[in-house]
Each structure stands twice: as structure tokens, then as C-alpha cells.
């Protein structure tokens, strides 16, 4: 019972970390990264499809992405999707491929993005703490129903706290890496 609660809490915390990592990946740094375009979609035969599933995205240099669609007719759709996304990128259509230069970030924009990283990270921490609260509530419920002893409950709560501390440290590490990427000129 206790192991099930611990495993469930840890799995849910890992999912929260994955969501945080995805959210942080969407924040544009000055460097070219293919996963930046992962959430941009195009209409591909009537289905909203991520660009990553309709084209090959490569890093040409530190500030330029190359996009080679798997079908020639998709270049204009991909260009339009990137232009209408909230990324502030201007792709260049070369006919059978696209080039997407990454504009340099000014200091003010970098600071705004760092604030955004901090708020996303705090939301991730809150999510992890809520999972801890739920798990501790489940432990207290078992104790109330006399299915476990007080010592078992205390040990389980300590284990949940250790898992929580580990996950929050991972969230902080993700945020620190993203902030470092943002502040690098």
C-alpha cells in the first residue's frame, strides 16, 4: 500500500517535471534548437501535425535552423505556420527547404524570458508539492483507518519528502540551465 502511494507520487512528479521541461523548451534562447519548433503545427491532409513530423529540422549553425519538408508543397505551409507562431521568427523560403535565422535577444528581452522561466519553474514546484500533499493525505488516511502504524506513516512521509526534494532539485537544475542559456550572449 505504502509502496503504491510512493510509486504513484514519484511517477506523477516525474510527469510534472516532463511538462516543465516541455514548457521551458518552448522559451526561445538566442541559439538555434530544433525542439523550439516542436509545438508549431501545420494542416497536413486535414490533420494538425507538428512540423517535426512533416519535415527534417537541422541546426545549420549556432543561429540558424534548416527545415527540409518531406513533401515539396509543404514549404509554404511551414513558413506560414512559423510566421503565425508566437516565436517571433522570420523563415526564408528557398523553394524545397527553409532557413530560419534566430534573431539575437536584447538584454531587456532576456530578463523578461528569465522571469518567465522562473514563473514556469515555480508552477512546476507547486505541482510537485501538491502531489506530495496528496500522497501525505493518502498516508494519513491509511493511518486513520489503522491499516498502518504511526512509525510506518512517519517513514512514508519522510520518503515522500525525500522524493519531493529530489524532484524540486531537478526542476531547479532545469531552470538554471535554461537561465544560463538565455543569459549567454
From Swiss-Prot:
Location(s) in or outside the cell: Cytoplasm
Single Gene Ontology BP annotation: cytoplasmic translational termination
InterPro entries, per the entry: Ribosome_recyc_fac (IPR002661), Ribosome_recyc_fac_dom (IPR023584), RRF_sf (IPR036191)
Xref: Gene3D superfamilies: 3.30.1360.40, Ribosome-recycling factor
Superkingdom of the source species: Bacteria
Keywords: Cytoplasm, Protein biosynthesis
Gene Ontology CC: cytosol
Signal peptide region: none
Keyword Cytoplasm included in the entry's annotation: yes
Family of this protein: Belongs to the RRF family.
UniProt-listed NCBIfam families: frr
Name the UniProt record assigns to this protein: Ribosome-recycling factor
Organism: Francisella tularensis subsp. tularensis (strain SCHU S4 / Schu 4)
